């Protein structure tokens, strides 16, 4: 039952689920920007352009002591399956620790 | 002496080999009378100025190069050192051009080591590649030959941008934005269109440990994508990283 639900879950929900389960997070905000990119040359021939481009704002204490690149790599690494499966871009517009937010 | 650019790779190679030198670019159009006049002036200044590279670039023929320097009208003269644009002189104004040469080139010449290689050597030098087949793997899991190629590419210029499309025709919004940001910051950069070579496109994801494009490298070091570069510009960090 759970497995079937997971497979019918959209990419946006899967990203949210993956990040919130793998990281301690104070905040995850995920925006679907796919509609802005569906007409671009690079998207030619892509079968489903509804869930290809997302924008993320994330706050996690686990980012403490990590460089920007390391924070982004951590998030990208957790979502490797999504990138392999058709996620084209995840803009991480903010990746902060709770201390950096306050 | 001044050198006429005849192909893009020649230009990129001169920039790569001339990192320590001051380079003066002359963007011109053969049909424009002011350009004809300024080309003569430019050639004379080139003869009189030692240890600087003077390049003539036909703007319409090399639209990608012209676009990356935001050339809207000719003649346009751009003075660069490393990855930084020192001055832009627009129009047929020999006095302004001479003033820029005196202001920037003469003081800098004393600071930088003169290279033994002449411009001609730089233009004609060919990078030798190992033609023996090499199927061994690099530590990151990439084929050694591809890994070496990516290493060469990421070091091909002080600042190297890997994007979808070209600076004049970016193929995605993120690439377009990053090109715009670099232009605003007057950053001179080399670029590679990853859509033209899938082995580079896929290989660079592993090489950089970064799954998306565009990707920016400075002095062979991975810096980040659009988000990180935007943040670095806001904080003034990017300018600090750029080579002098």
From Swiss-Prot, chain A:
Induction or repression: Expression shows cellular growth phase dependency, with the maximal expression at the diauxic shift. Expression is rapidly decreased when cells approach stationary phase. By UV light. Expressed maximally (3.2-fold) at 4 hours after exposure to 240 J/m(2) of UV light.
Any Gene Ontology biological process: cell division
Summary of the knockout phenotype: Leads to delayed spore germination and the unidirectional cell extension is not followed by cell division. Proliferates faster with smaller cell size than the wild-type cell during vegetative growth, but no other significant cellular anomaly, such as defects in septation or cytokinesis are detected. Sensitive to UV light. Shows a normal cell cycle delay after UV irradiation, but displays aberrant septum formation and defects in cytokinesis when released from the UV damage checkpoint. However, chromosome segregation is not affected.
GO cellular component, one term: nucleus
InterPro entries: BolA, BolA-like_sf
Swiss-Prot/TrEMBL keywords: Cell cycle, Cell division, Cytoplasm, Mitochondrion, Nucleus
Subcellular location: Mitochondrion matrix; Cytoplasm; Nucleus
Keyword Nucleus among UniProt keywords: yes
Main location group: mitochondrion
Any Pfam family the entry gives: BolA
Family classification: Belongs to the BolA/IbaG family.
Function: Acts as a mitochondrial iron-sulfur (Fe-S) cluster assembly factor that facilitates [4Fe-4S] cluster insertion into a subset of mitochondrial proteins such as lipoyl synthase (LS) and succinate dehydrogenase (SDH). Required during the last step of iron-sulfur protein assembly when the iron-sulfur cluster is inserted into the target protein. Probably acts together with the monothiol glutaredoxin grx5. Not required for [2Fe-2S] cluster insertion into mitochondrial proteins. May be involved in control of cell division, especially during the resumption from cell cycle arrest.
PANTHER family: BOLA-LIKE PROTEIN 1, PTHR46230
Protein name, per record: UV-induced protein uvi31
Species this chain originates from: Schizosaccharomyces pombe (strain 972 / ATCC 24843) (Fission yeast)
Lineage: Eukaryota, Fungi, Dikarya, Ascomycota, Taphrinomycotina
UniProt gene name: uvi31
From Swiss-Prot, chain B:
Keywords annotated in UniProt: 2Fe-2S, Cytoplasm, Iron, Iron-sulfur, Metal-binding, Nucleus, Redox-active center
Highest taxon in the source lineage: Eukaryota
InterPro entries the UniProt entry points to: Glutaredoxin, GRX_PICOT-like, Monothiol_GRX-rel, Thioredoxin-like_sf, Thioredoxin_domain
Domain Thioredoxin: 2-106
Binding locations of [2Fe-2S] cluster: 172
GO biological process entries: intracellular iron ion homeostasis; positive regulation of transcription by RNA polymerase II
Keyword set includes Nucleus: yes
Pfam family, one: Glutaredoxin
GO CC list: cytoplasm; cytosol; nucleus
MF terms (GO), sorted A to Z: 2 iron, 2 sulfur cluster binding; glutathione disulfide oxidoreductase activity; metal ion binding; protein sequestering activity
Stored PROSITE patterns: GLUTAREDOXIN_2, THIOREDOXIN_2
Keyword Magnesium annotated: no
Protein location: Cytoplasm; Nucleus
Domain Glutaredoxin, residue spans: 147-244
Binding positions (glutathione): 164, 201-205, 226-227
Annotated function: Monothiol glutaredoxin involved in the biogenesis of iron-sulfur clusters. Binds one iron-sulfur cluster per dimer. The iron-sulfur cluster is bound between subunits, and is complexed by a bound glutathione and a cysteine residue from each subunit.
Subunit structure: Homodimer. Interacts with php4.
Family classification: Belongs to the glutaredoxin family. Monothiol subfamily.
NCBIfam families: Grx4 family monothiol glutaredoxin
Name of protein: Monothiol glutaredoxin-4
Organism annotation: Schizosaccharomyces pombe (strain 972 / ATCC 24843) (Fission yeast)
């Amino acid at each position: 039952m759970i497995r079937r639900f997971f497979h019918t879950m959209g990419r946006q929900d899967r990203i949210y689920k993956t990040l919130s389960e793998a990281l301690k997070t104070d905040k995850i905000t995920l925006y679907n920007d796919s509609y802005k990119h569906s007409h671009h040359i690079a998207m030619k021939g892509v079968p489903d352009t509804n869930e290809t481009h997302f924008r993320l704002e994330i706050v996690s204490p686990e980012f403490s002591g990590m460089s920007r690149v390391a924070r982004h790599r951590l998030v990208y690494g957790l979502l490797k399956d999504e990138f392999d499966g058709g996620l084209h871009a995840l803009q991480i517009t903010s990746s902060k620790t709770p201390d950096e937010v306050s | 002496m001044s050198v006429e650019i005849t192909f893009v790779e020649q230009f990129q190679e001169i920039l790569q080999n001339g990192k320590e030198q001051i380079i003066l670019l002359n963007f011109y159009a053969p049909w424009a009378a002011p350009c004809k006049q300024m080309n003569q002036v430019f050639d004379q200044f080139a003869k009189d100025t030692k240890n600087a590279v003077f390049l003539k670039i036909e703007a319409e023929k090399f639209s990608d190069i012209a676009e990356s320097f935001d050339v809207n009208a000719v003649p346009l003269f751009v003075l660069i050192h490393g990855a930084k644009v020192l001055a832009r002189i627009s129009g047929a104004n020999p006095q302004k051009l001479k003033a820029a040469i005196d202001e920037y080139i003469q003081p800098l010449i004393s600071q930088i080591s003169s290279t033994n290689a002449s411009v001609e050597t730089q233009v004609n030098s060919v990078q030798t590649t190992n033609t023996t087949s090499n199927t061994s793997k690099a530590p990151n899991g990439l084929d050694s030959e591809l890994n070496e190629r990516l290493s060469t590419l990421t070091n091909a210029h002080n600042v190297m941008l890997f994007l979808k499309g070209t600076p004049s025709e970016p193929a995605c919004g993120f690439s377009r934005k990053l090109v715009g940001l670099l232009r605003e910051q007057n950053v001179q950069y080399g670029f590679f269109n990853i859509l033209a070579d899938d082995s580079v496109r896929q290989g660079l994801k592993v090489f950089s440990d970064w799954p998306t494009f565009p990707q920016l490298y400075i002095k062979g070091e991975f810096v980040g994508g659009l988000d990180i570069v935007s943040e670095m510009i806001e904080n003034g960090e990017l300018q600090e990283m750029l080579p002098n």
